[in-house]
Amino acid sequence: RICRRRSAGFKGPCVSNKNCAQVCMQEGWGGGNCDGPLRRCKCMRRC
């Protein structure tokens, strides 16, 4: 199962999945990507 959560540290609109993933990894998550109509950075990891 994959858990997802909005990044606490990502600022501004999410336009790069790579940048989002890097921020998520710094927060202790496995990665992340831009998601939804508002392009929020969502972090992911196994749970």
Curated annotation (Swiss-Prot):
Xref: InterPro entries: Defensin_plant (IPR008176), Scorpion_toxin-like (IPR003614), Scorpion_toxin-like_sf (IPR036574)
Family matches, as Pfam families: Gamma-thionin
Keyword terms, alphabetized: Antimicrobial, Disulfide bond, Fungicide, Plant defense
CDD domains named among the record's database cross-references: Knot1
PROSITE patterns in alphabetical order: GAMMA_THIONIN (PS00940)
Keyword Disulfide bond: yes
Disulfide bonds listed in the record: 3-47, 14-34, 20-41, 24-43
Biological process, per Gene Ontology: defense response to fungus; killing of cells of another organism
Domain of life of the organism encoding this protein: Eukaryota
Annotated SUPFAM superfamilies: Scorpion toxin-like
Biological function: Inhibits protein translation in cell-free systems.
Record family assignment: Belongs to the DEFL family.
Protein name: Defensin-like protein 1
Lineage of the species this protein comes from: Eukaryota, Viridiplantae, Streptophyta, Embryophyta, Tracheophyta
